[in-house]
Curated annotation (Swiss-Prot):
Signal peptide as annotated in the record: none
Coiled-coil blocks: none
Reactions performed catalytically: tRNA(Thr) + L-threonine + ATP = L-threonyl-tRNA(Thr) + AMP + diphosphate + H(+)
Origin: domain of life: Eukaryota
Protein species of origin: Dictyostelium discoideum (Social amoeba)
UniProt GO molecular function: ATP binding; threonine-tRNA ligase activity
InterPro entries assigned: aa-tRNA-synt_IIb, aa-tRNA-synth_II, aa-tRNA-synth_II/BPL/LPL, Anticodon-bd, Anticodon-bd_dom_sf, Beta-grasp_dom_sf, TGS, Thr-tRNA-ligase_IIa
GO biological process: threonyl-tRNA aminoacylation
Family designation: Belongs to the class-II aminoacyl-tRNA synthetase family.
Name recorded for this polypeptide: Probable threonine--tRNA ligase 2, cytoplasmic
């Protein structure tokens, strides 16, 4: 099926679903129920009020209003904040409630509930299957896989389980997946109920309530809400199985099964069509077709970039290097290998050593660096610093290595060897606000060039935070103010999800396919400067970035004291490899001229004009543009042009006797309409157009 037909098919499905929702909403607005008697009032989101008697459940309320609502609702929200199941009893006597019914199509909370429930079906089916196979497993994790920033997309959520084989040589095979799916389908048809069981346990200090979900003969310890019964899962599939990193040495490697499910076959069909479109844009396919990169089992997770892929990679770095020059960053080069003592000082050895490649040399333990920040702290600390040197913005494109499990490796999006557009800013506390603002402006500039939209999220103090509470509160207040100045109220708070060393701003970008990615991050770090004893001298009332509305975090600044700087971690691409993967899928391999590895190709109409074609190629090449020439005499001219078009050359230059005589080139532009692709240009005019394309990022 063609890309266009797939897109039209999905649009028809979406239009059909939207029409159904509109008809239901229209019915609600014209229907009223007025039960007589005592009880309480139920107010809906649209403002209508209904009176109900006795004890009610959201399901009985919904069915009395409209049975379609009762059928489609998965959860309900009581009084604007409390999520309850459709079967939970509401005491109506003398009380009024606001209630909202949540369906799968429109509400992320409902989808999360649905996929959590689906994970229990998968867990039960998997345990039943391996029990019959006499293989011992342990269920470690289960639930939904929904990024908070992708939760608004019906087609970007899944469910999963992680299991541990007692026999570590065991793995999940395709045949196992097929049989587990059949058991799931049987469980769904049987329409088993999900039951919430609660055990009250008296603790010495407090009452603790543990929740269990009983499903068939199995009990699952968890407190998430579920659907009422399994037959609400109309359509399901298992789409992936792989190994993932376990939580500790005892469970060092787990086996993960990922599935997808929907309450209607139409939604599943829609999802399948979208996967077909995604397959056409898969960066692994584009990378192979355009000869950009490949992987080899002799070095798993480490990419081999071919010449054309390297051109894109270097252009991305060149783009950032030019911006660094404009924005006051200094590029540095730091070592790849560090003594274990560095990682003990930074705290990574206790928390991250399992993700590091380590080895022994001269009876000393060393590791390949997985991040640049500790090395940059050494750079800051190698001599005394004054407040006059701050802010110090240093950037590093050094190679990083992280020991990802083999099963988690996936194209360029999850690798072991990569480079980050990593930068660290050392500044005084009262510079934080201005530096964060500049980082956000930088991010917006970059993402606008790539035609990404984005959403900002402030992650605040976690329970495991280190440092003074007052420092955290002032930092979070400062970041909140900057975000509000930057984008008004179009940002969200992710409570308790900050790093232990400081709050952070996560940036979630959306590509042309509607897929969300977290690449950029801006993090405050109060702990590494303490661990590495970083200091600067002086600073009272001497900073150009003072803001009367921004309190200083460090109140001990004076000209004779040594003060602690704040460290800001900043990345825009995340890893260059991952950004390349996103851009491949975002552009579907149709690179804009400024990034393109195939900017131009020269094709002679016959071998008689090969020399002239080579002369044109040489001039374009020496002018600094990526140009090829096709001198293959065994191919017809039409085939050469067709192959160049499929290969996504931005410009195709065809030369023959007329071009020699007139010194005017016959140029075909990829991005012009089909009936207007060919133009006549002199070589100088062509260079002017190339230069303009690069300046305007076209």
């Amino acid at each position: 099926m063609s890309f266009l037909k797939l897109t039209k098919s999905i649009q028809k499905i979406n239009n059909f679903n939207n029409n159904k929702i509109n008809l239901i909403n229209k019915y609600f607005s014209t229907t009223n129920i007025n039960n007589s008697g005592g009880g309480g009032n139920i107010k809906l989101n649209d403002g209508r009020i209904f009176k109900f008697e006795d004890k009610q459940t959201p399901l009985t309320i919904a069915n009395k209003i409209n049975k379609t609502i009762g059928k489609q609702s998965i959860l309900s929200r009581l009084n604007g904040n409390k999520l309850i199941s459709m079967k939970e009893i509401i005491e109506m006597s003398g009380k009024d409630y606001n209630i909202e019914f949540l369906n799968f199509e429109e509400h992320s909370d409902a989808r999360i509930c649905f996929w959590n429930s689906s994970s229990l079906v998968l867990a039960r089916a998997t345990m039943e299957y391996f029990k019959n196979e006499n293989k011992e497993i342990e269920l470690i994790n289960f639930g939904h896989l929904v990024n908070p920033q992708t939760a608004d997309n019906i087609n970007q959520g899944t469910f999963y389980i992680d299991i541990f084989f007692k026999d570590k040589n065991q793995t999940i095979k395709d045949n196992d997946i097929n049989k587990i799916k059949k058991i799931m389908e049987y469980i769904v048809k049987r329409n088993d109920k999900f039951e919430i069981l609660k055990n009250d346990q008296q603790d010495q200090d407090q009452d603790q309530e543990e929740s269990f979900i009983k499903f068939g003969e199995f009990k699952f310890k968890n407190n998430f809400l579920t659907i009422d019964s399994s037959n609400s899962i109309v359509s399901l599939d298992l789409i992936k199985n792989s190994s993932v990193v376990g939580p500790n040495k005892e469970y060092s490697e787990l086996q993960r099964i990922v599935g997808i499910s929907f309450p209607s076959k139409d939604q599943m069909n829609n999802w399948v069509e979208i996967q077909k479109i995604a397959a056409l844009r898969d960066h692994r396919v584009i990378g192979k077709d355009q000869e950009l990169f490949f992987f080899h089992p002799f070095s798993p997770g480490s990419c081999f970039f071919l010449p054309h892929g390297t051109k894109i990679y270097n252009k991305l770095l060149q783009f950032l290097r030019l911006e660094y020059r404009k924005r006051g960053y200094q590029e540095v080069i730091s070592p790849n290998i560090y003594n274990q003592k560095l990682w003990e000082t930074s705290g990574h050895w206790d928390n991250y050593k399992d993700n590091m490649f380590s080895f022994e040399c001269d009876h000393t333990q060393y590791s390949l660096k997985p991040m640049n920040c500790p090395g940059h702290c050494l750079m800051y600390a190698h001599r005394a610093r004054s407040y006059k040197e701050l802010p110090m913005r240093i950037a590093d494109f050094g190679v990083l290595h992280r020991n990802e499990t083999h099963g988690s490796l996936s194209g360029l999006t999850r690798v072991r060897r990569f480079q980050q557009d990593d930068a660290h800013i050392f500044c005084t506390p009262d510079m934080i606000r201005e530096e964060i603002k500049q980082c956000l402006d930088f991010m917006k500039y970059v993402y606008t060039i790539f035609n990404f939209t984005f959403h900002l999220e402030l992650s605040t103090r976690p329970d495991s935070y280190l440092g003074e509470l007052s420092v955290w509160e002032k930092a979070e207040t400062s970041l909140s103010q900057v975000l509000t100045e930057f984008c008004g109220d179009k940002w969200t708070i992710n409570h308790g999800d900050g790093a232990f060393y400081g709050p952070k701003i996560d940036i979630h970008l959306k590509d042309a396919n509607g897929k969300n990615h977290q690449c950029a991050t801006i993090q405050l770090d109060f702990q590494l400067p303490i661990r590495f004893n970083l200091e600067y001298s002086g600073g009272l009332n001497n900073n150009n970035n003072n803001n009367n509305n921004n309190e200083e975090i460090n109140d001990n600044n004076n000209n004779n004291s040594l003060n602690r700087p704040v460290m800001i971690h900043r990345a825009l691409f995340g890893s260059v490899e991952r950004m390349m993967a996103i851009l491949m899928e975002h552009t579907a391999g149709k690179w804009p001229f400024w990034l393109s590895p195939r900017q131009c190709i020269v094709i002679p109409v016959s071998n008689k004009f090969n020399q002239f074609a080579q002369e044109i190629q040489s001039k374009i090449n020496l002018a600094g543009y990526d140009v090829d020439v096709d001198l293959n005499d065994s191919k017809l001219l039409s085939k050469k042009i067709r192959e160049a078009t499929v290969s996504q050359y931005n410009y195709i230059i065809v030369v023959g006797q007329e071009e020699i005589d007139t010194n005017i080139l016959n140029v075909r532009k990829r991005d012009l309409p089909e009936d207007n692709k060919q133009v006549k240009l002199s070589l100088n005019d062509l260079f002017s157009e190339f230069k303009l394309n690069i300046e305007q990022f076209k």
